[in-house]
């Protein structure tokens, strides 16, 4: 069994400049951080003792004979993209969906990470970010920018720059004292 824990993110500056329609023409940059709220994905092989081959547990339970029958678009497309079969996947989170903190992208990154582990392959932070962007923006055709997937994959406090269909991540290093000060003066609404 593989268990992943992927952080959620909040942005400080640059929201909207992570949209390809914007940054391909003008460039873009965001400052974001992950924080101590997470999504958890478990993935394991499902023995052939059941009358279904894939089980997905989130706010619903889906049991299907083939991953292409899954209603959840991100899971269906990720399983097809990485050729995953005969699995039980569960999703839990510290925060509700649609909170504005990148929950769907954290789920995508955590799920892809779990799938790579199940296959015995290493996926770098960069690879996870790029695959999550492809999954959500291309395969699932969800509107939005790129910062959520990148923040979830890289974690920490970062400046993320966007230009010409690509991105780069630069960690922002701050002292433990400054981090405590920042944490004690932030409020989320």
Description of each model-found segment:
Residues 1-65:
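Generic N-terminal targeting/processing segments that precede catalytic cores or assembly contacts
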Residues 2-7, 13, 18-28, 117-189:
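ATP-dependent small-molecule kinase catalytic core of the GHMP/sugar-kinase superfamily
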Residues 36-135:
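Anion-binding (especially nucleotide phosphate/pyrophosphate-binding) glycine-rich loop
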């Amino acid at each position: 069994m593989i268990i992943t824990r992927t952080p959620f993110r909040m942005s400080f500056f640059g929201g909207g400049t992570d949209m390809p329609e914007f940054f391909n023409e003008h460039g873009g940059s965001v400052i974001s951080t992950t924080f101590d709220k997470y999504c958890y994905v478990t993935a394991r092989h499902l023995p052939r003792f059941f009358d279904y081959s894939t089980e997905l547990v989130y706010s619903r339970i889906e049991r299907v004979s083939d991953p292409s029958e899954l209603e959840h678009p991100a899971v269906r497309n990720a399983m097809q993209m990485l050729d995953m079969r005969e699995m039980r996947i569960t999703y839990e989170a510290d925060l509700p969906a649609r909170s504005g903190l990148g929950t769907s992208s954290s789920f995508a990154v955590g799920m892809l990470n779990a799938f790579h582990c199940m296959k015995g392959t290493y996926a770098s932070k960069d690879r996870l970010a790029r695959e999550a962007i492809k999954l959500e923006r291309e395969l699932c055709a969800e509107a939005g920018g790129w910062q959520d997937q990148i923040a979830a994959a890289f974690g920490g406090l970062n400046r993320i720059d966007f230009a010409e269909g690509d991105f780069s991540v630069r960690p922002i290093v701050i002292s433990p004292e400054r981090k405590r000060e920042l944490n004690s003066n932030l409020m989320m609404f």
